[in-house]
Amino acid sequence: MTAILHAMLGKGLGGLEQVFLDYQPILEAWAARRGGICAGVVRGGGAVAKAQSGRTPPLLSMPAHTDWDPLTLGAARRIVRAVKPAIILSHGQRPARLFEKAAPKSARLAICVHKPVFDIETTRTDYICVGRHLAELAVERGVPASRVHFVPNAVKIPTVLAQPFADPGRPPRIVAAGRLHPKKGFDVLVAAAALLRDRGLSFEVEIAGEGDERGKLEGLIAEHGLGDRVRLVGWRDASAFLATGDLFAFPSYQEGFPLVLLEAMAVGLPVAASAIPGPDEMIVEGASGRLLPPGDAAALADALADLIADPAAAVGFGRKARADVLADYGPDSLARRLSAVVDEIANRA
């Protein structure tokens, strides 16, 4: 019997949390084929614990204070004693450090790397990286290549698709989504919208999400006189919201392998995104979307203006983007890749 302990202690319901939820049934199925279990562990009182309260099998929960907090470390040790895991797979640094302290030496350790900031332990830990750039970084930092694995994120294939530029009676709608945080670059999108307005283009922008940057963004929208064109609409169901758009803007500064970009591609939206590690693995410039320098409002405005001016080309980008997601980034692809990696970790002598 092979037991897996699968841990994620994020408090929100963003990309990291969604990847954990995507992994959990795959790991449960993998363990069940070997007569074992996969125990999912989340932060007590966090968004995932609340959203998954009726799940079968249930997720375990624990406190998530500091790495050395006696209550938190004690909970990790109790969970390890109860589950007796052969493999511990963690999302993020905190659960990785906690369960490394709590785990017996016989346990195989793995961490899913979502961003280019992570601890390195070269003798015992496998690194499951959601982007090729993250896998390359792990090897550069000294992790043996045999312990580094590339498993790109995936999305459920939506049944409702965008219909870009299908309604000539309304202005083109540019949509964006994500946590309202400086690294997401939504201030760049607001500045690009001001440039588009000054060029006399008709359009509207809707940004879905919440976060600490809301007040600043509201101020920028007012400062540029864009209140009638740019709206912050709060959190929305991602696929349904994205399907209302004609174009998707992704002006981020730093990413792993962003789910919301995959979701936009999956509904068939033409995309204008920052040419940064992660997105540049997902989009082929001039074939499945547009890539442009991060932080460059003029370049973003130019790309969006070009797409608006040539709807046929934009629609073609969206179709190619969706085809790429269907081919490489659906649930079946994730299950196959992740299961193969867990096989390798479990079978290593």
Regions found by a protein language model. Name each.
Residues 40-41, 270-273, 283:
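Short hydrophobic beta-strand element within catalytic cores of glycosyltransferases
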Residues 14-25, 172, 176-201, 205, ...:
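A conserved mid-protein helix/loop that constitutes part of the nucleotide-sugar donor-binding site
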Residues 68-72, 90-96, 113:
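Short His-centered aromatic/hydrophobic patch
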Residues 284-286, 290-297, 306-311:
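Conserved acidic donor-binding segment of nucleotide-sugar-dependent glycosyltransferases
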Residues 133, 154:
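Carbohydrate-associated surface elements
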Residues 6-72:
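N-terminal strand-loop element at the rim of the active site
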Residues 253:
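Aromatic "clamp/platform" in nucleotide-sugar-dependent glycosyltransferases that forms part
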